[in-house]
Amino acid sequence: MAQIDEIAPDLYRISVLVPELNMQFNHFLVRDDEPLLFHTGMRRMFPVVSEAVGRLIDPASLRWISWSHFEVDECGALNQWLGAAPNAQAVCGQVGALVNLQDFAGTSRACTG
């Protein structure tokens, strides 16, 4: 189960504890006209994170999906999120897009910032 905390107006931290790793992972949702999910989490965390996002917005309404760097806990569930949010674009830096994103995501729905 995820813990949701509003850390600023319409900015939410979604925290998920993975007991077998004894680690907590944080994901951030900006609730806006064009909602942003920052950090997708690992693929195995997708059901928990998407349920938490669903308590705040319709996950299909996500417009932007981004992360700080390319590792499984930051963007491992990217493809699941792109499937759940048909109008969402993945957003990352140019080098990340060239080196990782287009190969990993297998989609042209990528944007560099």
Question: Which residues fall in each region the model found?
Answer:
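Active-site HxH/HxHxD metal-binding segment of metal-dependent hydrolases
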Residues: 45, 54-113
